[in-house]
Amino acid sequence: AGVSKADLLIAATSTQQVNILTCVIGKKLGVKKCIARISNSELLHRRDSFDYRSIGIDEVIYPETLGASEIKTLLKESAVSDSYAFDKGKLRLIGIKIDERSELKDKTLAETTYLNPDTSFTPVAIVRDIEDKIENETIIPRSHNILKQGDIAYFIAQSDNGVDTVLSLSGRENLQIKNIMIYGGSDLAYTSAKHLSKKYNVKLICEDLPKCEKFADELPNVMVLNGLGTDVDFLREEDLDSMDAFLALSNETEKNILASLAAKESGVKKTISQVENIEFVPLAHNMGLNTTINIKYLTANFIVNYIREGELLNFTSIEGLDADVIEVEVKEGSNVLDNKLKEIGFPKDGIIGGVLR
């Protein structure tokens, strides 16, 4: 397989022991860098006390921690469907669905400039549902493009005032979240419940009785219940309609979508659904479930950022958006210095969302 000539080995099977052993063997055969996926969060926390490089592992990934961190951000910024920070949060990429409340609806980007007098935000992408097509269309917007009802619009916004301006124009505000219901017996559900219970009141619904007993023992601050996440009557008996957020985090995409729809019908204002099958993302969005999470995407972003460290400051690929977001540093000697974009051959299907100076 030529492993001795490889610059990078990524061991990301579902079996932790196989991944660790693969990296150990790979390093001995001459691989320059090795990344191992782990399934035990305790190993992640030991990075400060144990030198993984001594056994041939340069970096460890625990995807569920990446997912739990993403969920924490999405709950904090509950008015948006996506949120990513750049340069320690000075700029943010946010996604918002355009509905009847939005002042941006039915306006071209040129017509919205008066709503953005201090240029605190820039529209950078539009995801639109196209009738009779399974996949949504991604548009890199220009001044003539119109924002339509049902679009998911992505903005690069200044954190200090741009984000609030976009939320205000969209008729949205962040919710004060206190009570959360989580459905699922997955590692992501467990990890999320563990982290979120430090700040919120958390109920965890799990269909597997042995897992329920295990979770109840290990998560003292979480109310663990045995039941079906798609049983609406059961969920309502457990006060679904009084929840501020519902997280469908089982390993079954279809059940997550159904459970989130039930939560939405019951009046829960914020839902987050784990969607393992990428082809289901447009379907979920078209059904009104705008906030989805896919830990494969998060893991891929982590790996790309690791590989490109030094070349890119940040790389982000967003599920459902047929475009990538990159953050780069303009270095001395670069061809773009002191030149206009039209003079440097900047891609027509690209856009600069912001400049940090």
Task: Locate predicted features.
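Cytosolic regulatory regions of ion transport systems
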Residues: 1-357
